[in-house]
Amino acid sequence: MSELAIRRGAAPALAVEGLGYSYPHAAHAALEDVSLEVAPGEFVLLAGRSASGKSTLLKAACGLVPHFHGGEIEGEVRVGALDAIATGPGELAAAVGYLAQDPETQVVSTTVAAEIELPLELRGDEPGDRARAVEEVALALAIPHLLERTVDTLSGGELQRVALAAALVTRPRLILLDEPTSQLDPVAGDELIWLLRRLNEEWGVAVLLAEHRLERCLAAADRVVAMEGGRISFDGAPADFLAWAQDADPALETPAARLFSLAGIEPLPVGVRDARQTLRRPGISHPPRQASRRVRDPRPTDPASTPVLSARGIWVELDRGEDLRDVLKGIDLTIGPGERVALMGRNGAGKSTLLRTAAGLHEPVAGKLEVGSVALLTQTPGDYLVRERVGDELPGDEGLAALRVVGLEHALDADPRDLSGGERQRLAVAIALAGRMEGDQLPGLVALDEPTRGMDRARKDDLVDLIARLAGQGALVADGSTNSTHDAAVVVATHDVEFAAAFAARVVLLGDGVVIADGPAEEILSGGWYFATEVARVLDLPGVVTPEQGAAALGETR
Amino acid sequence: MKSPFAYQPRPGPLQSASPGAAVAYLGAIVAVAFLYSSPVVLVAAGVAAILAGLLAGARRAVRVALKMGLALALLIVVVNALVVSRGETVLARLGGWPLLGQVDITFEAIVAGLSGGLRAAVAMVAAAVYSACVDPDRVLRLLRPLAGRSALTATLVSRMVPVAAADAARLRDASRLRGPGAAPVGKAPLARRLLAGSLDRAVDVAATLELRGYSLDATRARNRRARSRYDRRFYAVAGIVLVAAIAGKALGADDFQTYPEVEVGLGPATLALSALVALSGLAPLKRRATRRTTADGTKTALPNRKSSRWQEMAGRRGVARV
């Protein structure tokens, strides 16, 4: 009998029975007839598109629903021996920890040590017990070196770990996580998943993790629960989930599973290791490395074309609190018309600073920057929406032209708050574009900073279409004086390698303020560990990064 | 950008001291500023506050507070000079002004304003040093048993203010990035948006507090007595400064008069008190360890940078010094 089966015999860490819930004044129920059990020590992945009910289910399991949000609830939720509907989140805190998407709003103290200690202090624990618990959880999460730091000096990944430590310090038997890696770079995201697996294996903490990037965590999960329209649509093993998603909801397929299904290989793999093992089986021939195609350099070779951005040795220094720090260190970069460029690199590498400098928000302290009109969408599209009617945000012909470009001309009278997340983002793009266009032609450079945070696959696909459409529109070139038109270049700063592989022809990889790699997307995204797609990690073939390319490469050898 | 007054953990004595000791020490300097009007003593208190900040590593906080304090001092001098016409040394007669009536600028009013301005500047620098060097979490933990809800409100404010400042900066950037064809963003819509965002964040933070167990009716947690080996030093310096200030006041060390003529006393009591107050700024000085105790209990001298340099210099000159 497996250990998991033994654990399954014990009282479940979480038991949900016939749960239905509606937020106050909501037209539709957020959850309908949800029944679910999480065994002690089990790692369960919660999959589903945006607004499918994942977050609400997690909030019900930690008591925020209905105690904090109100609304109408029916059914039963038990966390260990506690009734989560009758008991408030405070009482449940000892039995369940909760980690949300945005680490910024999950810390309330000034220093890390005080933040982690707060739940114990509020519970009335003795000072000695608190000191030990803080030390233990800091060691478990590898953050003892952060204890004396102030929370405003931490990176997103560090802050997320601190929030996790505060959620775990009471030693709950269940931890709920709502897209905890959505704001992290691939390195920090993978580290967090690895950490969860270790907590799960070594300390027996049951994990219920809601996540969009399934390829990141499917291999770590014991079980997958998929949700759709507030109901559970699938509950089973990861391999069975992939077979189910193939027919029921292809947007939930992982890239490796899609590669296998396109190539007609069974069974579908739950992770890179699994996929490689399957490919080593007799009867399946893995293409040799040299069989890969030559990758064409996407940069324009026409010397007559005027670049839309030309940076030569630019340095940018920013005030980071105590001292000025060089964030960009002599960047050389040229982007031509019509290019689709992914700007990648870990948090703090200088991606956003480069885009903000191009848009005129920062002034280089050295070097030469030549750039025409730039429309930049920052990381929070909501910041652009300040009025209650789309038409009031974008008045006149210029506004209408911008709305047409993003396909929102029908929504003139809508309230931006009533639009979907994707539509709000497109509206923000239109606001950045308005007045920078020549008729229906876009400005020279359209820049998007981390546009896929918290997005599901379907919305990312929509964004890929939008980028392709933007890159196909005419634009004013850098020396606007010539008034000649070219295609617009689109530059997207992103951590999402799969998204980069889907839209970009070229990838520029930044590391600590310098360009460390610049080349065709297929080449850059197949030549590393972290900044490589799942298909690239499975096949390890230069130039093969998407499931379609992978299936073609496998097909050549079969 | 991080506020210059934000707390920054550093390994200095002032940061290591318990909040009570740090407050007593900086409070004593501020108390001198409010007890005395003599510019000599006020300058000494200012020197003490600046020294304390610099030795504690809060250079940026001191610099910014000094700039703000001196600007405020200048404002007080100007306002006092315009509003108060007392004093015998008239420097300028500016005639009749609406609301103010006859305005005569006198040397005495300027000096009186300078005294008030210096007092404000000292208080500002001391407050900046407190803010940059004293861990607010430890202060709030100290206050929590006395006023739990107020302490928590203060915690939230101290957390939400920098978050709101970051939100405001982001919204300003977004308004600058709007295309010229989009409706311009006035201050009112921006403020509304900032308020709405802050409320959303406040709701999220409130949810976090709920999850941390804020609503629990737990018995008040006992706190460790936050002790430091520097506490006695700061309490002692605070005590000495306060006792000397009170005694000096009784002995006429605050010998300063502005009207009808300026008279600044420079008697021994004033000078001694000023020297003592200025020297109190050295309290956060970290003493270098000069001896190391080995495992067997023997004590050996530690090489320090100064003596090494001396030895190096002595060696170059061909003189052996130990």
Spans of model-derived segments:
Chain A
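ABC ATPase C-loop
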Residues: A167-L168, L433, M437-D440
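H-loop/switch region of ABC-family ATPase nucleotide-binding domains
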Residues: E211-H212, T494-H495
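Conserved ABC ATPase "signature" region
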Residues: G128-L146, L309, I314, P395, ...
